[in-house]
Amino acid sequence: MSTRAPASADEFLTGLKGQRVLVTAGAGGIGFAIADTLSRLGARIVVCDVSDEALAAAPSKIDLVAAVKADVSRDEDVDRLFEAVEKKLGGLDALINNAGIAGPTGGVDEIDPADWRRCIDICLTGQFLCARRAVPLIKAAGGGSIVSMSSAAGRHGYAFRTPYSAAKFGVIGFTQSLAKELGPHAIRVNAILPGIIEGPRIEGVISARAKQVGISHEEMTGRYLQNISLRRMTSPYDVASMVAFLLSDAGINISGQSLGVDGNVETL
């Protein structure tokens, strides 16, 4: 760990080269941007995903050690994933708990309990299942990082997206608890709260919400942007930059934090 200021921009994000990193849901969206960014900075990356198509395409776009099909909500898939991590990387320095789904859109009296459970299982329980396997490896490495994806919906209640918001609030509690538990082992644990991420998922959410309230897709998009101080959606690479910072030596004393990368979402 450096005790002086960096001499140049090139020296700022040190400590990433050679890091062994697992990125869940890393073959598309935010996960792809994270894997791409960390790989370019010299990290050795394993990704998992549920999409065969995305997994097949990712290695031609990113320098990956391995791409593994796994559903993080399934114990047996997570066990198999970490067997691959140990075999391919020989250990682990960082876990990026990125996997998640949008979950159902609807009033609490309209949501199917199976859809509720599926959202919680992937967005929250999956982070637990991965962390419980990652922690012994990161301890054995002498310390490292866990970065988990929450959401602006983990800071603001989100009407008609109750399962998703509940899961993302849970991620923050999980993160703060792990930070206290793992700090003595030199493991930093932080949550990132992305805002409205550009891409097909939010387009689907906006369409569903617009249909519910009886307005056009364009008008609903404008309403979403009106609640963001910077009046812009968030790029997956905005989030990836924060992950790189947290995993680098620049983030050596940051733990237990919930960091918004959202253009300052004022409300949802």
What are these regions (language model features)?
Residues 131, 167, 175:
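Active-site helix of classical SDR
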Residues 4, 191, 199, 215-254, ...:
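C-terminal helical subdomain
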Residues 183, 188, 254-256:
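Short, small/polar-rich loop/turn modules that mediate ligand/substrate recognition or access, typified
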Residues 151:
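Residue(s) in the substrate-gating loop at a strand-loop-helix junction
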Residues 2-13, 102-105, 156, 232, ...:
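Short C-terminal tail/terminal secondary-structure segment
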Residues 27-28:
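Conserved glycine-rich cofactor-binding loop
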Residues 106-108, 112-120, 224:
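Substrate-binding pocket helix/loop in short-chain dehydrogenase/reductase
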